[in-house]
Amino acid sequence: MKNKLQLIIQIVFLALFLVLIITGRVQLWMGLFLLGIALALLFSRIYCGWICPINTVMNGVSWVKKKLGIKRQKTPPALARPWIRYLVLALFIATFITSMITGQEIPVLPALFAIGVILTFFFPEELWHRYLCPYGTILSLPASTAKYTMKIGQEKCNSCGICKKVCPAAAVEVNEKQYTINKKDCLVCLDCADHCKQEAISYC
């Protein structure tokens, strides 16, 4: 299910992001993010899985770690708390408002880009996607009501758990041996569908 088209789209948006940073116009990226919020209302968090430059580079880092056999640390329990994501979001909003009031440009997006990539070297991707990324927290709100999302067909699912294992955002949940995908946390990255041997997972 995951294909070359997705990779091409990710690389194109990553290149655009880098160009905006180099030319000092990274603030224009917010236009794409606002589009991502609008799209999330219907199509879930496709911004995260297909457009976000942070996620694209994190995928590359994870691939390198896997090839080199580098073991990742577990997500620190102190950070794996539901309220952490909202605390980070509050700090993000406060920084944004401060920037507007003072007129001083604060490189929030480049800083988040660096933090997300660095954390991936040491911890699972879910730490960033689920708890620390303020953009992801914002997108999780409209995504919770999205019509189209990744779904597990229960008639095909054999509860092998591979989808839960490969999900970078820990969006796959288990309730009485039944696997489901929490659409507010799902990145629509297609990793689960790509690894499902039963072909039980689809975007619909």
Model region roles, listed by residue range:
Residues 180:
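Minor-groove-contacting beta-hairpin "wing" of winged helix-turn-helix DNA-binding domains
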Residues 1-166, 175, 184-187, 191-194, ...:
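Non-ligating segments of multi-cofactor redox enzymes
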Residues 171:
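Conserved N-terminal phosphate-binding loop of PLP-dependent enzymes in the Aspartate aminotransferase
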